[in-house]
């Protein structure tokens, strides 16, 4: 927070209130987490305490960090020498635990900061090396799913829990959550290694999940399939599945499910809405040879998408030229939409870390499309 580019953080000692409503005693030091042990730093640390009227004590760290070697003999000797210089604030080498124990005595008097501790800098790290963010989040979900399936298989007496393999895969994921890998601010070679790690992670998770699904659903009916809900809440949402040859629809409890039969380059598949599948459970559906119930369908052409609610028109570059609301009989698009743009990205410093406030002022619309497909 000391590197905010617009607003100075207002407190040193405070209670941070999270979105859950819980309070945590916090301290924002005005000096960096690494540096020298000298007179200037001692005064900077002392004078930076904005709550000195509540607790007249400050906290600072010294040494070479971020891959350095910590404190040096010279720093420790200087710390002893500063104790004998008149006018220099009294210092003592201690620990963060002892510091927080001391200021905790006055914590009820601290101001409360309610909400996100937003860092006004390094906004580019939300998008840099996007494949890392994508694989990280997918890996977190898949690891949880693998743990659920492994636990279920063990509880049902079908196989042992794969603790060792899950630990190995978790460690691959966690290594790549290091604070420079995940934001996208590492050097190029790091991301070559990260791609290899994620490939190994994805292979391992796919193998483990498929093994557990095969164990749990070993007595499968070739005319049936099970939709599994890994969430801890009931799930309602779209399900897409390939249709075996000769089948046209899906049924549950001997009732036809409204669905849409679609096709792509890989063959025919069915799309339907699975409603209220219980948490951490599943529901088995059956393929049916009956024709699927008629559903209001989307009309899709080269320059048109239309259903019973909206009519959306596109030009030959893929830009939206019209959105017509059929229910209210009115046009709702004021100007051309879906314009694809690239923007000039020349941050003042740390190019992988930052986006400047004014980047939106330099758009370059991509007006000519080689091909457009709806």
What kind of feature is each model-predicted range?
Residues 163-167, 175-374:
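Catalytic and substrate-binding regions of extracellular carbohydrate-active enzymes
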Residues 11-220, 230:
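Active-site and substrate-binding clefts of carbohydrate-active enzymes
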Residues 1-5:
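Zinc-dependent metallopeptidase catalytic helix centered on the HExxH motif
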